[in-house]
């Protein structure tokens, strides 16, 4: 017995002596990986769930770092380990920046959207950086320097494949997670060993439960495995859900028969700015005039229901009446579906549908998805090769509209008011509102600019004799979280929906969802004979007082009679998009 113990001890000593510098490099790589994952945990998970156990996550993070870096032992060129290490750093850093803007983990599919890497997007990302983010950069840089100038030649002399450390690491990792599952079963938190890996409310809490490796494995599996066909039970459920919607085909706003429709989707428009003045300057004088007009619809308590697709998710809801995916962007994952849409509803009446954007066709896959929505033309890159300002968009739109055969439907997608807000955009008196943080003041300035562009556009419609025969709908693509502020009335969580020349005066004072915009527009445009009215409700017909987020949270009146259906709509929409292909 003693002899065997001595033999084992001698073997361990020989292993360490033969692989001394290799193990030093692995320790440095391990520290670097641990540092990046810990940044992810501390800035995202701990911020979301203050009750998350730090000691438990120290152990999880250590195991995750060891597993992710374990290929180090089986490649003879140890320097290759910097490839997964740098990829891990990039993911963790991107996730932290994404979270600071959108309060969620960036989906892996977003890294394939290289077309979205515009200077504006990069500037927005860098604006989210903080000094603590060095945790994802400095350790890797220091490890790289030490490897290059101190360890490389010594590690190369020890070059050999070592399988048993990998086997030990993976075995301990699996045993650790089995232990966690057994513990959860004993505490009656879950019923089976696999429950913790498939039952979770959101991505962040999934990471909290299962760590980085569990998170990566789960999303890899769900992305690569084929989507199952719609079952008979699911088909019946969808049909029963749709059958319970109000059925109507009457058009109560006949004054809008064959009127043109212009839908302006405003980047990052928070509704609290509407009607507000500071330092003697209105933030949104144009929108204020529309809101106060006797022929307009106003809703300033709109719940943003966008998910990973952000701006493209807003467009998706307004165009199709479906909710976005809970993971990934519809615009890039399901761009080949022939959706029912407002463009197709109008084209039955000989409308021409045109989409215009300040960005390129490749941004959020505009070229493909606009075809799926039924647009006849998609006009992009108005500046030749780069994004343009909102003023250029509006000027070019007027040029096109003046010679456009009527009736027409134009969708105009703005972009100047995109984050970051590092400096005032065309400074006005609003910059003197020192009761607000600098970021909020700069935000007010750029929204003021976009509002002026919309105002000039509306004035051009009037001067060209087009206004009276045109309905103008204005909707926020999503809200924009800004610096915390205690000024009364400040709210960066609600979006806006406004319709000028609507044929009716209506102010929706309670909460509604972005999903309710599509059926409301059908109502306004006298398209109620179109079979597909979406998964929302026209606020002109139904007393909507609530809306549901993707995680099942109800906003507004939680006891609203529609609340349970609004929650279920997310699952119904997901199945329609991913399983039925929803062919028109």
Name each model feature, range by range.
Residues 50, 55, 71, 84, ...:
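Proline-rich intrinsically disordered, low-complexity coils
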Residues 5, 9, 16-17, 227, ...:
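Intrinsic-disorder-associated interaction segments
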Residues 97-110, 127-130, 231-234, 311, ...:
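A diffuse structural propensity rather than consistent per-protein peaks
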């Amino acid at each position: 017995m003693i002899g065997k113990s001595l033999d084992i001890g001698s073997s361990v000593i020989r292993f360490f002596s033969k692989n001394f510098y290799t193990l030093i490099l692995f320790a440095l790589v391990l520290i670097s990986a641990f540092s990046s994952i810990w940044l992810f945990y501390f800035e995202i998970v701990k911020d979301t769930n203050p009750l998350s156990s730090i000691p438990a996550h120290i152990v999880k993070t250590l195991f995750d770092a060891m597993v992710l870096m374990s290929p180090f032992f089986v490649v003879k060129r140890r320097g290759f380990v910097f490839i997964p290490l740098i990829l891990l750093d990039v993911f963790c850093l991107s996730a932290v920046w994404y979270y600071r803007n959108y309060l969620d983990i960036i989906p892996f599919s977003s890294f394939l959207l290289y077309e979205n890497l515009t200077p504006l997007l990069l500037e927005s990302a860098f604006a989210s950086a903080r000094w603590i983010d060095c945790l994802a950069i400095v350790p890797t840089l220091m490890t790289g320097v030490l490897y290059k100038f101190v360890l490389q030649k010594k590690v190369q002399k020890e070059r050999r494949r070592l399988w048993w450390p990998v086997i030990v690491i993976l075995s301990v990792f699996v045993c650790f997670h089995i232990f966690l599952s057994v513990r959860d079963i004993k505490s009656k938190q879950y019923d089976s060993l696999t429950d913790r890996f498939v039952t979770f409310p959101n991505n962040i809490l999934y990471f909290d439960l299962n760590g980085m490796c569990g998170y990566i494995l789960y999303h890899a599996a769900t992305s690569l495995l084929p989507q199952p066909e719609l079952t008979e039970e699911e088909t019946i459920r969808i049909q029963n859900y749709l059958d319970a919607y109000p059925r109507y085909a009457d058009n109560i706003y006949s004054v809008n028969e064959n009127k043109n429709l212009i839908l302006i989707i405003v980047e990052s428009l928070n509704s609290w700015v509407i009607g507000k003045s500071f330092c003697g300057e209105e933030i949104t004088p144009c929108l204020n005039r529309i809101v106060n007009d006797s022929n307009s619809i106003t809703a300033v308590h709109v719940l943003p229901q966008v998910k990973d697709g952000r701006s493209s998710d807003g467009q998706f809801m307004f165009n199709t009446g479906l909710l976005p995916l809970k993971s990934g962007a519809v615009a890039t994952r399901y761009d080949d579906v022939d959706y029912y849409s407002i463009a197709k509803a109008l084209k039955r009446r000989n409308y021409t549908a045109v989409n215009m954007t300040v960005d390129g066709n490749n941004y959020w896959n505009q070229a493909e998805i606009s075809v799926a929505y039924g647009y006849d033309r998609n006009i992009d890159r108005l500046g030749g090769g780069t994004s343009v300002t909102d003023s250029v968009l509006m000027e070019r739109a007027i040029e096109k509209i003046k010679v456009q055969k009527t009736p027409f439907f134009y969708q105009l997608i703005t972009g100047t008011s995109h984050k970051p807000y590092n400096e005032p955009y065309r400074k006005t008196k609003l910059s003197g509102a020192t009761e607000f943080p600098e970021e909020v003041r700069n935000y007010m300035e750029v929204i003021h600019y976009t509002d002026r562009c919309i105002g000039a556009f509306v004035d051009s419609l009037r001067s060209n004799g087009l206004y009276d025969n045109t309905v103008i709908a204005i909707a926020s693509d999503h809200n924009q979280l800004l610096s915390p502020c205690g000024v009364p009335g400040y709210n960066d969580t609600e979006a806006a929906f406004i319709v000028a020349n609507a044929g009716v005066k209506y102010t929706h004072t309670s909460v509604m969802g972005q999903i309710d915009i599509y059926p409301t527009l059908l109502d306004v445009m006298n398209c109620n004979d179109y079979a597909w009215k979406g998964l929302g409700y026209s606020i002109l017909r139904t007393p909507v007082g609530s809306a549901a987020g993707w995680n099942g949270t109800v906003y507004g009146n939680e006891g609203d009679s529609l609340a349970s259906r609004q929650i279920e709509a997310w699952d119904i929409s997901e199945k329609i998009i991913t399983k039925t292909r929803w062919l028109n």
